[in-house]
Amino acid sequence: PRKGEEMILDKKASALMDTVMGKFDISSSASHTKGGGILVTADNNLLLGPNAVETPLREDLSTTPEGIDMVIKKQQMLMPRLSKGSIITYFAGVRASTYEEQFVIERSKKVENFVQAAGIQSPGITAAPAIAQDITKYCIDAIGESISKNEKFNPIRKPIPKVRELPREERDKLIKKNPDYGVIICRCEEISKGEIIDALQSPLKVPTIDGIKRRVRAGMGRCQGGFCSPQIVKIIAEHEGIAIDQVAKKQQGSEVICMGKSTGFL
């Protein structure tokens, strides 16, 4: 496995650039990484990294001061004004890399009905649609039956309204129709109570703090949920009809509020 550490910067830092940049040492052809880069995300944050560090543990999602320094120093060669003070969060992911540095997209030779999509690194971002088509063919072959395309399938779903992006007139109409859209819960990202409830009522339920964050970005701003998390916990608990100490950050066992007896110590 190969771990990569990345950083997300405050939206204010996006004023430094509006494109994708990367520095690659062409003299090091044996390198297993381009060294990451700088890019503006769809939500207008700057994303730095990743680096590439071999790890024996496939679930090693730890970040290190050394890794963060490595990424920052490398990207400062492209943009000297980058500062650690702009970092709002950092994280790591692990890639199933191969020593051949090649994609492995094929039906398993040992496990029935198992399709492998491994060894996929940075190029996988652009290759994903083609990879999905190949895997679809492998799955159909594995089933061994003739499958017809559902012509009635509609891949377009109605999105959750983004209050912060609406013109004033449309926002006023939406709030008059449902006042919850006028209650701003996440100040950093301007996410309303109505948007959070929409996410909780979606076909694929996400009654966790991280689930709401990924659906509507509540908690993804500068304070990283420091202000809005308690309100989000309350909204989830009320909507789901559960106690606040049953609301999890990500999954069962990651509840964020303890309602047990006090031991008398702080």
What are these regions (language model features)?
Residues 25-27, 32-35, 42-43, 54-184, ...:
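C-terminal catalytic lobe of FAD-dependent flavoproteins
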Residues 186-188, 223, 228:
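Short cysteine clusters
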Residues 1-22, 73-76, 80:
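Central beta-strand plus flanking loop segment that forms part of the substrate or channel wall
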